[in-house]
């Protein structure tokens, strides 16, 4: 099989939510492709497509959850090929979540999975997360970075509020902040004083490595 065919098979298995098919595709791809490529261009590509179909009303939440489970199983199957994952806390500790008032979960979950597979210790605290919970969790796990996702214009201010609370608590100097989500932009990141903006999951991994190196 060509590289493209392997990647298509990986993505297709995630889209159809077939865990067995995902594991079989991962097994097949292991000897041919780099683990990060299997995740980013195969599994995550499939999950991104699921997200698009969900947003368009073509798929429903149970399908999304099953696809996410299938993708997670695929990532787990690659753990033994990712030596840096065993020293994840050395790469950096990241708290990741979707801000209060926002129930979107897919993009944030993909980012968490990919950060984890890149070797970071990730604490995904879910969606619709109150501002103070981000800061409390960061203190609890001694986080190096907080990832803030917002998928609606109305919830964007929550990203700014987390940064303000970090300042009030005297933690801002020690905790980097990365923002993302459809309405977020580099200009918004600059305005609220975030350390970086990531347009997608691959960029989130690259920027986290850059900031926490």
From Swiss-Prot:
CDD domains documented for this protein: corrinoid_protein_B12-BD
Domain B12-binding N-terminal: 1-90
GO biological process, one term: methanogenesis
Pfam families: B12-binding, B12-binding_2
Entries under InterPro entries matching the protein: Cbl-bd_cap, Cobalamin-bd, Cobalamin-bd_sf, Corrinoid_p, Dimeth_corrin_MtbC, Met_Synthase/Corrinoid, Meth_synthase_dom
Amino acids binding methylcob(III)alamin: 104
Domain B12-binding: from-to ranges: 91-213
Pathway(s) the chain acts in: One-carbon metabolism; methanogenesis from dimethylamine
Swiss-Prot/TrEMBL keywords: Cobalt, Metal-binding, Methanogenesis, Repeat
One GO molecular-function entry: methyltransferase activity
SUPFAM superfamilies (alphabetical): Cobalamin (vitamin B12)-binding domain (SSF52242), Methionine synthase domain (SSF47644)
Function: Acts as a methyl group carrier between MtbB and MtbA.
Annotated family: Belongs to the methylamine corrinoid protein family.
Protein name as it appears in the record: Dimethylamine corrinoid protein 1
Organism for this UniProt entry: Methanosarcina acetivorans (strain ATCC 35395 / DSM 2834 / JCM 12185 / C2A)
Gene designation: mtbC1
């Amino acid at each position: 099989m060509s590289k493209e065919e392997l990647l298509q098979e990986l993505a297709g298995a995630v889209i159809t939510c077939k865990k067995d098919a995902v594991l079989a595709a991962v097994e097949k791809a292991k000897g041919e492709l780099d683990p990060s490529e299997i995740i980013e261009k195969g599994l995550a590509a499939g999950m991104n497509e699921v997200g698009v179909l969900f947003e368009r009303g073509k798929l429903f939440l149970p399908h999304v959850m099953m696809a996410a489970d299938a993708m997670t199983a695929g990532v787990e199957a690659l753990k033994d090929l990712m030596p840096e994952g065993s020293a994840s806390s050395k790469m950096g500790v990241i708290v990741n979540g979707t801000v209060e008032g926002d129930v979107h979960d897919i993009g944030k979950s993909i980012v968490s999975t990919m950060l984890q597979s890149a070797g970071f210790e990730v604490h995904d605290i879910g969606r619709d997360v109150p501002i103070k919970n981000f800061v409390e969790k960061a203190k609890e796990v001694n986080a190096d970075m907080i990832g803030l996702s917002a998928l609606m214009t109305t919830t964007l201010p929550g990203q700014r509020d987390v940064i303000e609370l970090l300042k009030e608590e005297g933690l801002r100097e020690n905790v980097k902040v990365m923002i993302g989500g459809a309405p977020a932009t580099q200009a918004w990141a600059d305005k609220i004083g975030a350390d970086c903006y990531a347009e997608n999951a691959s960029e989130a991994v690259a920027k986290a490595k850059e900031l926490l190196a």
